[in-house]
Amino acid sequence: MENNVLPEYVSGIPTAKNRSRERMDLIRYYYSNLWKRLQREGKTNKIFNDYLGVDVYVAENESDKKTINTASKNWQSTYAVKHLYDIVINAAGDENQPVYVSVKTGTQTYNGYKNMAILYYDFVNIERDYLNFRAKLTIGVKANDKHVQYCVNKIEVKEKKPTVQSNYP
């Protein structure tokens, strides 16, 4: 199999666009497993993010709701949810983007966030091209400075066009 041929399943996740319902179920399963893991480790549903230097809470019925709807749309986002523990630990800001942004109206305001932190995590795999993508981790920051994982999803990265030097003045 070639490096750029997308298989029907990646790490147990269906890759076909029309399989979002199955991916929703997998995301629920991944969150359930993550909460169980955090409880076993005595972390009370929180994971320390090295970049921000804060605990990020993975709150049941808050962290999972937005992600279930958003991440089920494509397999890479579901793959990111499967690796959420590592993403929360290692996600960092992008030097070309502000880390903290204003909340949007709707769910972000309803959840009581005063602002949002946007971090990124790059999946890199030298053997399989389709496993090279960027995930965006959105964290809601409450008035008491509690950081809550809001959403994780795959994002499209627009490549910068190379600058072509010109001989003209």
Where are these regions (language model features)?
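Ribonuclease/tRNase effector modules and their secretory precursors
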Residues: 1-169
